């Protein structure tokens, strides 16, 4: 065997070297391809992750749970901001009497405001405590029977024809929500005086209603109908026997014996302004309660009309209605033709027009919708007779109608005549 030459050996070495280089190149390409594939996979994974993140973020935003609580949170923030922006001064920091407020009001209104002794040193919180009259359902109360359809005059004032039976305006205690008691006691006393031949006026005790009527809360307020029921059942002592104190600690006194008490016969409810006016014309003042707006506290004169955006108290205040009228358009009261009610208040003669106020009709202040008539024995008897007359007239009319229906028809037509001839 002939040995390989040196050239052959070198050629083989070169061939092996080239093969190694080729394998290395192939391996390098494989590594590069693998790296590219990994990079591509990483990019694809990253893009998928981004898409998934965006999708998850969108789904989170539309999740009803987060939407609900997010909405509630926004509403809460809105309420807090609005409360902060519209913070109101507490009522116990706002005085009833304010000269600056009076000046602003009086410069642009037909009715005027002013100071009065009753509200000196008082705040709107104090006033709110006095508006404590409440109302029960009227479904079980007697409706007044108002006879007659006589024309209601344009104006009427019970004070003009019954001056001898007019009590002075009550000045109730500033701390006592007893307007319902003072209105009932003074109304009954005046009506009894108006009915009497000698026109003798005997003031009656409002304090008895405040101290002795357990169905109400005394100086903390009460129901007008409860006080009227007490007055009918138990009667009222005279003011001389049980004088007005208007305090929370005033005790019920047994010193005023039953024979000394005055009782009305009953009471009834008047519905609507026409019935209220006819009752006042015939029998005297009536008792009602009104919604009170803050600007009414400082009323001085003119025809009161509640202001725009003026707050009102949540309770009611009891008053007496004594008449009505129409503004004549004088210089001081230029609201010509404006119809109004005349009411008697219980804040003293220094308030309003000597304790009275003119209130524009149709303001929905509640008192003109219905009122109470305190019925004396004489008034009750007159009402009974009126009802009997009405029932008798209705019965006679029904009988007459029945007789008319029973009369045979004597006006025969031609067919009837022909049918009767043989």
Language-model segment annotations:
Residues 1-41:
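N-terminal targeting leaders characterized by basic, low-complexity, disordered sequences
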Residues 6-8, 43-46, 189-190, 208:
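Acidic-residue sensor for enzyme active/binding pockets
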Residues 11-15, 19-22, 47-50, 63-67, ...:
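Alpha-helical segments embedded in low-complexity/disordered contexts
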Residues 15, 21, 35, 43-44, ...:
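Intrinsic structural disorder/low-complexity segments
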Residues 29-35, 42-49, 395-398, 415-420:
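Low-complexity, intrinsically disordered tandem-repeat tracts enriched in small/polar residues
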Residues 44-60:
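Juxtamembrane low-complexity tails/linkers enriched in Ser/Thr-Pro and polybasic
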Residues 64-65, 72-422:
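Catalytic-core signature of thiol
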């Amino acid at each position: 065997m002939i040995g390989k030459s040196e050239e052959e050996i070198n050629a083989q070495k070169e061939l092996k070297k080239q093969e190694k280089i080729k394998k290395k190149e192939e391996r390098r390409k494989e590594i590069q391809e693998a790296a590219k594939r990994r990079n591509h996979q990483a990019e694809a994974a990253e893009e998928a992750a981004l898409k998934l993140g965006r999708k998850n973020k969108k789904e989170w935003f539309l999740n009803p749970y987060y939407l609900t609580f997010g909405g509630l949170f926004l509403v809460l923030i809105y309420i807090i901001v609005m409360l902060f922006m519209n913070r109101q001064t507490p009522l116990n920091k706002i005085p009833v009497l304010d000269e600056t407020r009076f000046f602003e009001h009086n410069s642009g209104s037909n009715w005027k405001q002013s100071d009065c002794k009753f509200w000196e040193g008082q705040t709107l919180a104090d006033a709110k405590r006095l508006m404590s009259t409440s109302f029960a359902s009227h479904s079980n109360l007697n409706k007044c029977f108002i006879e007659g359809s006589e024309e209601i005059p344009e104006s009427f004032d019970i004070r003009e024809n019954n001056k001898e039976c007019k009590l002075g305006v009550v000045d109730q205690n500033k701390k006592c929500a007893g307007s319902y008691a003072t209105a009932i006691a003074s109304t009954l006393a005046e009506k009894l005086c108006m009915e009497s031949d000698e026109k003798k006026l005997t003031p009656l005790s409002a304090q008895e209603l405040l101290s002795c009527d357990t169905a109400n809360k005394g100086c903390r307020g009460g129901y007008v109908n409860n006080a009227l029921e007490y007055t009918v059942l138990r009667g009222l002592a005279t003011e001389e026997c049980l004088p007005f104190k208007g305090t929370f600690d005033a005790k019920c006194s047994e010193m005023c014996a039953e024979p000394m008490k005055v009782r009305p016969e009953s009471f009834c409810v008047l519905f609507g302004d026409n019935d209220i006016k006819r009752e006042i014309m015939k029998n005297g003042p009536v008792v009602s309660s009104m919604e009170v707006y803050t600007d009414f506290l400082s009323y001085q004169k003119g025809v009161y009309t509640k202001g725009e955006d003026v707050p009102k108290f949540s309770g009611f205040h009891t008053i007496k209605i004594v008449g009505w009228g129409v503004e004549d358009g004088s210089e001081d009261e230029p609201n010509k033709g404006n119809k109004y009610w005349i009411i008697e208040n219980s804040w003293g003669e220094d308030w309003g027009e000597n304790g009275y106020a003119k209130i524009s009709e149709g303001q929905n202040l509640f008192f003109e919708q219905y009122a109470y008539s305190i019925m004396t024995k004489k008034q009750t008897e007159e009402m009974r007779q009126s009802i009997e007359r009405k029932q008798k007239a209705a019965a006679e009319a029904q009988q007459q109608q029945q007789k008319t229906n029973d009369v045979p028809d004597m006006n025969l037509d031609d067919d009837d005549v022909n049918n009767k001839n043989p």
